[in-house]
């Protein structure tokens, strides 16, 4: 379940006119803080039934976190909801272990050993070698301590190297976060997507106009999960992790073939991707056994010397999908990482992207034009984006196309002063077009950028940054 407040309100805290995740797009059908509301209602009715939270809302609020809506540090959602556990991240491994344990007769309070879960306890007697985080009482009043705590959490998001973490809530005991579950193998990914999903909304919703958000993804293929891009404003590190997990070509071809039998399918696959469309393998071989590096990103500020830059598997997959009978066109809409494309010396992918997979406009996310702001964002310098545009234009000329790159920009990110905002505005003006949208920075729980926004500190050192706003 996504954050309900995010679908109810803009970042300016104004009511949205439409909720794309509700029947007919109608606003107001779901309560704010739905995880807390629904969990407490269940607890009132089923007092002894185990309640396990899952999904991105619970995952990002699993420990003490800054809440933009109330402008303060909130408890772990586990305390406010009255639930017993959180299965954080994507959850397949942990939810199966939880179900098996409960089915065997174990009480829910005994389930302290499952990777990818968060639970509460009175003391630390059953927690092996935990990292003791600053207490909730400390982080809610001291911004530097909050930044220190978040830095520790950020460094413990890898299943191969993370340790349990304990956060004290005084007389209420401790919230314990176990290390993340191991990433799914390709076989496991295929098994997940081979399940008999109806891919339809409940019939009762159809009468109310359906769920608008479903139309956007109905004929799209999820080919991967996880992202080693490392953007500071993105919550994926906390939710899906940095290790790439992919589906096999066979799995994706089978799903695409099923799509062609849908009466509503018009021959167009809208997307083949995931968090980043063109990531199809771990960033380096080390990740498969050692996990990701601490205090070091794969692409920022420049690509790591150990980075494997290779689009050949993705190119092969797209070629196979294009050949499926009944498929007229395969588009890529979930976002191409332009610095990864620039780093690839083999330009086959870029050429075929332009020739076959762009629906007139390619959406890319440079986010800003100020290198100082881009540094705070964890994004490559503006010169890398300019280089991508040159290569993209050249590929269009080579293929006889005239397609445009539509940039997505973000305003108000921590570190962006009026000077940088004017620089971005002038750049957009000089482009000669009005962008469809500019995302105002949204302080989502559990991101580095949100920590900067709240504390004014630059991680990992937690030194106060004079030029952060």
Where are these regions (language model features)?
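Conserved SAM/AdoMet-binding glycine-rich loop
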Residues: 258-406, 410-414
């Amino acid at each position: 379940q996504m954050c309900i407040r995010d679908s109810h309100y803009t970042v300016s805290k104004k009511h949205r006119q439409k909720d794309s995740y509700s029947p007919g797009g109608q606003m107001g059908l779901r309560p704010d803080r739905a995880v807390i509301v629904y969990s407490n209602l269940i607890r009132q009715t089923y007092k002894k039934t185990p309640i396990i939270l899952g999904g991105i809302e619970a995952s990002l609020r699993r420990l003490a976190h800054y809440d933009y809506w109330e402008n303060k540090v909130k408890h772990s959602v586990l305390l406010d909801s009255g639930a017993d556990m959180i299965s954080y991240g994507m959850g397949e491994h942990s939810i199966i272990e939880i179900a098996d344990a409960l089915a065997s007769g174990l009480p829910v309070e005994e389930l302290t050993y499952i990777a990818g879960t968060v639970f509460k306890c009175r003391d630390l007697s059953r927690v092996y070698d935990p990292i003791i985080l600053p207490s909730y009482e400390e982080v809610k009043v001291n911004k530097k301590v909050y930044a220190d705590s978040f830095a520790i959490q950020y460094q413990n998001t890898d299943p191969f190297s993370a340790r349990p973490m304990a956060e004290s809530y005084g007389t209420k005991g401790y919230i314990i976060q176990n290390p993340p579950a191991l990433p799914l193998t390709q076989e496991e990914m295929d098994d997940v997507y081979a399940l008999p999903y109806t891919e339809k909304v409940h019939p009762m919703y159809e009468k109310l106009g359906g769920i608008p958000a479903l139309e956007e993804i109905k004929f799209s293929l999820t080919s991967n999960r996880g992202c080693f891009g490392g953007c500071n404003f993105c919550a994926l590190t906390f939710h899906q992790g940095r290790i790439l997990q992919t589906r096999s070509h066979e799995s994706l071809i089978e799903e695409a073939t099923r799509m062609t039998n849908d009466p509503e399918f018009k021959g167009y696959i809208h997307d083949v991707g995931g968090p980043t469309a063109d990531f199809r393998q771990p960033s380096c071989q080390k990740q498969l056994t050692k996990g990701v590096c601490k205090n070091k990103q794969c692409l920022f500020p420049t690509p790591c010397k150990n980075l494997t830059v290779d689009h050949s598997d993705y190119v092969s997959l797209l070629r196979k999908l294009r050949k499926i009978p009944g498929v007229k066109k395969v588009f890529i809409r979930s976002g191409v990482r332009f610095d990864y494309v620039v780093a690839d010396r083999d330009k086959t992918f870029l050429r075929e992207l332009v020739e076959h997979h762009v629906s007139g406009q390619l959406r890319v996310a440079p986010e800003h034009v100020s290198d100082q702001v881009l540094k705070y964002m964890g994004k490559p310098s503006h010169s890398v984006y300019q280089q991508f545009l040159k290569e993209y234009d050249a590929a269009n000329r080579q293929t006889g196309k005239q397609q445009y790159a539509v940039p997505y920009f973000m305003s108000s990110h921590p570190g962006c002063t009026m000077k940088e905002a004017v620089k971005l505005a002038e750049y957009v003006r000089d482009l000669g077009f009005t962008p469809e949208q500019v995302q105002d920075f949204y302080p989502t729980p559990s991101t580095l950028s949100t920590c900067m926004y709240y504390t004014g500190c630059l991680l990992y050192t937690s030194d106060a940054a004079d030029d952060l706003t």
